[in-house]
Structure formats: C-alpha cells, structure tokens
C-alpha cells in the first residue's frame, strides 16, 4: 500500500519508474499454475499502468542455470518455466511487452533497452 501511495504522489509526466517485475510477471506465473490471467488483471486494475515493459527472453534451461540467488530460493521446474516463457511470448506478440533477446551479450541487451526507452520518451 505504501508503495502504491508513493507512486500516486510521484505520478507526473516527468517521472520515470523502473520496476524489475510487474503485472505481467504475476499474470504469466499464475497462468502457468492454471489460473486465469484476466483474474490477475482484475485484482491489479488499480495498479498504475506502465508505459513501457520489457521481456528479456532466455530459455528455461538458461533460467535454471542463471538462478544462483539463494536469497529468495525460488525454483521452478522446466515444465513450468516453458509455460511461463510461452505466456511471455504471447504477450510480446500482442504488443504488451518489448521483446529483448536475453541470450545476447549484456552490452547488446543494454543498447537495445536504451534504444527502446529513447524511442518512448
């Protein structure tokens, strides 16, 4: 609640918010669990909408390989990660997310994200 209030206070045309995860994350993971994504959208209808959202695509196998952060200890099976990836690709196809190839080198990824941000400013 406090974060939402902070967003409302700071909501002006010159403010840029950068989130590491947002509504689409909740949607695709709930869909991977068999829930209806529209339900997730409905319960999040009062959350401020993003002007630009990215999906950084990597394979499920690469996701498991890169998941070395024991802070959160979040582990999903390959089968769930495949569904998650398919759902993200569905939303990129609908134009709700900007597709970024996460298998490319970090400099290339950074350039592509910066170009997309500049295009939307």
Question: What does each model-identified segment do?
Answer:
Residues 1-14:
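Phosphate-binding/switch loop-helix module in NTP-utilizing enzymes
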Residues 11-13, 31, 67, 92:
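Hydrophobic residues in alpha-helical segments
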Residues 15-19:
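Generic beta-sheet signal
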Residues 21, 26-86:
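A glycine- and Lys/Arg-enriched "phosphate-lid" helix/loop adjacent to the NTP-binding pocket
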Residues 61-121:
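NTP-dependent small-molecule kinase module
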